[in-house]
Amino acid sequence: MTLQWTAVATFLYAEIGLILIFCLPFIPPQRWQKIFSFSVWGKIASFWNKAFLTIIILLIVLFLDAVREVRKYSSTHTIEKSSASRPAAYEHTQMKLFRSQRNLYISGFSLFFWLVLRRLVTLITQLAKELSHKGVLKHQAENINQAAKKFMEENERLKRLLKNYGKEEEHILEAENKKLEEDKEKLKTELKKASDALSKAQNDVMIMKMQSERLSKEYDRLLREHSELQDRAGKDKKCL
C-alpha cells in the first residue's frame, strides 16, 4: 500500500473510532456540547471549514482515481491481452484489480464517514441544545407549578379567612341590628311618652288659658263693680 492510501486508511480507521466514541451511550450530548464549546474550537473554526472542504475534495479525487483504476483493470480485453503475452500477467492484473477495489472502498467509505461524522457532530450539538432547552423549560414548568400551587393555597387561605370573616361580620351585623331594633323600640316608647306629655302640656296650657280668660273677665267685672261702688259712695257723700 502506498503512502497516500496508508494515510487514507488511517483516516478511515480514525473516523470509525470517532463515530464509535460519539455513539457511546454513557456519554451524554451535554458533555460533547461542553467539549465542542472549548475556546480552541472557536479559534480554529475558519481553518476547520477550509480543512473539511479540502479533505472532501481530496477524498473525491482519490475515489475517482480508484474508480478509474478499477475500470482499467477490470476490462476483459486488458486481462486477455496481458495473459497472452505473459503467463503471470493474469495474477498480476488480478492483484492490481484487488488493490484498486480496496482503494475504492477505502476512499468511498472515508468520504462517506467524513460526511456522516460532520452530520453526527451537528446532530449531537442540536440534541444538546434541545436537551438544555428542555431542561430550562422543565425548570420553568416546575417553577410555574410551584407558583400555581402556592397561589392556590393562598387562594384557599383567603377563602377561609373571608368565610370566617363573613361569619363574624354576620354575627356583628345581627348584634347591631338587634341593638338598633331595641334602640328603635326605646325611641318609639320615649317618643310616645314625649307625645303624651306634649299633648298633656297642650291641654294644660289650654285649661290655663281658659282659666286666665275667665279670671281676666272676672277681674274686669270686679273692676267695673268697684268703680260703680266708688261712684255710688261719692254720690252718697255729696248728698249728706
Curated annotation (Swiss-Prot):
<dbReference type="GO" id="GO:0006886">
    <property type="term" value="P:intracellular protein transport"/>
</dbReference>
<feature type="topological domain" description="Lumenal">
    <location>
        <begin position="65"/>
        <end position="103"/>
    </location>
</feature>
<dbReference type="GO" id="GO:0006915">
    <property type="term" value="P:apoptotic process"/>
</dbReference>
<keyword id="KW-1133">Transmembrane helix</keyword>
<protein>
    <recommendedName>
        <fullName>B-cell receptor-associated protein 29</fullName>
    </recommendedName>
</protein>
<dbReference type="InterPro" id="IPR041672">
    <property type="entry name" value="Bap31/Bap29_C"/>
</dbReference>
<dbReference type="Pfam" id="PF18035">
    <property type="entry name" value="Bap31_Bap29_C"/>
</dbReference>
<keyword id="KW-0813">Transport</keyword>
<feature type="topological domain" description="Cytoplasmic">
    <location>
        <begin position="28"/>
        <end position="43"/>
    </location>
</feature>
<keyword id="KW-0053">Apoptosis</keyword>
<dbReference type="GO" id="GO:0005789">
    <property type="term" value="C:endoplasmic reticulum membrane"/>
</dbReference>
<feature type="coiled-coil region">
    <location>
        <begin position="166"/>
        <end position="233"/>
    </location>
</feature>
<keyword id="KW-0931">ER-Golgi transport</keyword>
<comment type="subunit">
    <text>Homodimer and heterodimer with BCAP31. Binds CASP8 as a complex containing BCAP31, BCAP29, BCL2 and/or BCL2L1. Interacts with VAMP3, VAMP1 and membrane IgD immunoglobulins. May interact with ACTG1 and non-muscle myosin II.</text>
</comment>
<dbReference type="GO" id="GO:0006888">
    <property type="term" value="P:endoplasmic reticulum to Golgi vesicle-mediated transport"/>
</dbReference>
<feature type="topological domain" description="Lumenal">
    <location>
        <begin position="1"/>
        <end position="6"/>
    </location>
</feature>
<keyword id="KW-0812">Transmembrane</keyword>
<keyword id="KW-0472">Membrane</keyword>
<dbReference type="Pfam" id="PF05529">
    <property type="entry name" value="Bap31"/>
</dbReference>
<feature type="topological domain" description="Cytoplasmic">
    <location>
        <begin position="125"/>
        <end position="240"/>
    </location>
</feature>
<comment type="similarity">
    <text>Belongs to the BCAP29/BCAP31 family.</text>
</comment>
<dbReference type="InterPro" id="IPR040463">
    <property type="entry name" value="BAP29/BAP31_N"/>
</dbReference>
<keyword id="KW-0175">Coiled coil</keyword>
<dbReference type="GO" id="GO:0070973">
    <property type="term" value="P:protein localization to endoplasmic reticulum exit site"/>
</dbReference>
<dbReference type="InterPro" id="IPR008417">
    <property type="entry name" value="BAP29/BAP31"/>
</dbReference>
<feature type="transmembrane region" description="Helical">
    <location>
        <begin position="44"/>
        <end position="64"/>
    </location>
</feature>
<comment type="function">
    <text>May play a role in anterograde transport of membrane proteins from the endoplasmic reticulum to the Golgi. May be involved in CASP8-mediated apoptosis.</text>
</comment>
<keyword id="KW-0653">Protein transport</keyword>
<keyword id="KW-0256">Endoplasmic reticulum</keyword>
<feature type="transmembrane region" description="Helical">
    <location>
        <begin position="104"/>
        <end position="124"/>
    </location>
</feature>
<feature type="short sequence motif" description="Di-lysine motif">
    <location>
        <begin position="237"/>
        <end position="240"/>
    </location>
</feature>
<feature type="transmembrane region" description="Helical">
    <location>
        <begin position="7"/>
        <end position="27"/>
    </location>
</feature>
